[in-house]
């Protein structure tokens, strides 16, 4: 995850990259957010889930109030095929999408490129749904 974080940060200097966080033994994640989502108090998290051995991308809010507002907004606008979360204790996402199931850690370069591509695509679709132009 540390190498992935560094790779994404170097390849996408217009994104704000957060520190690497280790969850409750079940996940590891870091924020990777463009300014046009950050200004809306939203963030993108690149998440590795240990038990299913998969990578996901989550759209989250800066707090529970923001999260609830955007879950409501996306429930009315649609999610572009992404999984919409429900407001409930312990749920930290607004939208979730799988990036890689059973990732091939024997080919880290390809895995990082695949994850980058899917994260950027997800960000662009979210921005489109929200009706903004992506600043790149």
Locations of regions flagged by a protein language model:
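Long, solvent-exposed, polar/charged low-complexity segments
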Residues: 1-8, 99-136
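Charge-rich, low-complexity N-terminal segments
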Residues: 1-28, 36
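A short, terminal or domain-edge coil/loop segment
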Residues: 3, 65-84, 111-115, 135-136
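Contiguous interface-forming segments/domains that mediate binding rather than catalysis
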Residues: 13-14, 52, 89, 116-117, ...
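Short, solvent-exposed polar/charged micro-motifs at secondary-structure junctions
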Residues: 25-32, 93-98
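Aromatic- and glycine-enriched beta-alpha-beta binding-site module
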Residues: 28-76
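Solvent-exposed, flexible loop/coil residues
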Residues: 34-36, 41, 86-88, 103, ...
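An amphipathic alpha-helical core segment
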Residues: 71-105
């Amino acid at each position: 995850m540390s190498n992935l974080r560094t790779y994404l940060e170097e390849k996408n200097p217009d994104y704000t990259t957060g520190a690497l966080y280790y969850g409750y033994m079940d996940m590891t994640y870091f924020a990777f957010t463009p300014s046009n989502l950050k200004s809306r108090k939203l963030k993108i998290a690149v998440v590795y889930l240990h038990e299913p051995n998969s990578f996901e991308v989550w759209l989250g809010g800066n707090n529970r109030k923001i999260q609830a507002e955007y879950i409501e907004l996306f429930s009315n606008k649609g999610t572009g095929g992404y999984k919409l979360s429900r407001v409930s204790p312990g749920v930290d996402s607004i939208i979730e999408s799988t990036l890689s199931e059973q990732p091939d850690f024997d080919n880290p370069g390809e895995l990082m490129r695949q994850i980058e591509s899917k994260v950027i695509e997800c960000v662009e679709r979210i921005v489109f749904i929200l009706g903004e132009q992506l600043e790149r």
